[in-house]
């Protein structure tokens, strides 16, 4: 007999039990469910809704059940539907009618809202730790490559010289925003819904603030109808994780490009590469490719959540059971990707000579050549046109700009002097860009210092 079966004259069909049950995936919330029930039982006793003796017995038995689950001594039942009913059924089997008092003043609607909030806030903390580890790795790579020059790209065409440190710190900023988004999302997750009942609260004199304090929530929900039907926090976290994966995917794409012979900027460690079943020479960046591929999976989880919640009337609907597999999958995927990605970039070999050689080609100093003329008094648009013609001349004559002799320079502008060679050297092109946020050494070091300060607060 179901715990809710009093109104029914027959048992549910086995196919309905199988279809309706969520225990196979929501069982992972057993700890949060039991901790929430312990706090609820403690509050029921303190508020004299049940006796103190019964409250203590329920709490102690729930702790025993938690220990037994963690030791693998408990087998959940499909016909008990979900983690909430499974735990309650086990409780009743151990202490009889006293266990039946636990659900006083509570519905599964506010109970599941509590469990998922407690579960997700724990996961946010774990993901944030993984991100901080990634950020520290990026800073170490940046420190070791302050003077490593490579071309910066636009449209995947060589554009201007930067440093590898500057490039790594660009990704640091992306993941910093991810941490900030998670921190902000955490605020809306960490709101306590218990006491909202099925939808209209309860007539019992519950102390919601006590339960919130016991469970470490910052505040309580302010509308019972909203509290049991709200999954914004789930969708918001899914969106945060989707953006995070987008950043990992962009980084992965560059890793894949850089590891190719066409770029040759890095070599991935053997431990983070794979081979081919037919081509003996292959060393494939499978980790980066799989991270890139799993990004679409996390996007799909977000779209699934949005689709489930679309058009649902207030308050709780069974559709909302579908929220868990999507958010669990997104969380699991991110937690799987971050550690292996961090180790992959931590162990990769930086080919500084190849990076410099690439920066020396492709006229990456052309903008600085135009700026040189501007500093001599030529309007920028005129300088832009002059240097465009100079680049065309260099292409036709198979020369780099810095390889032109003075007579060739003078053919484009009489204002060009011997100092041009120093001004358009790659090192000067980089060091001259010393504004805050620029690629110059002092600018990147300041960015690293700011990054370390940020991480110290996480």
Curated annotation (Swiss-Prot):
- List localization entries: Cytoplasm
Gene3D superfamilies from the entry? Fumarase/aspartase (C-terminal domain), Fumarase/aspartase (Central domain), Fumarase/aspartase (N-terminal domain)
According to its UniProt record, which reaction does this protein catalyse?
A: 2-(N(omega)-L-arginino)succinate = fumarate + L-arginine
* Organism domain of life: Bacteria
Q: Keyword Cell cycle, does the record have it? A: no
Which BP terms does GO give this entry? arginine biosynthetic process via ornithine; L-arginine biosynthetic process
The identity of this protein, by name, is: Argininosuccinate lyase
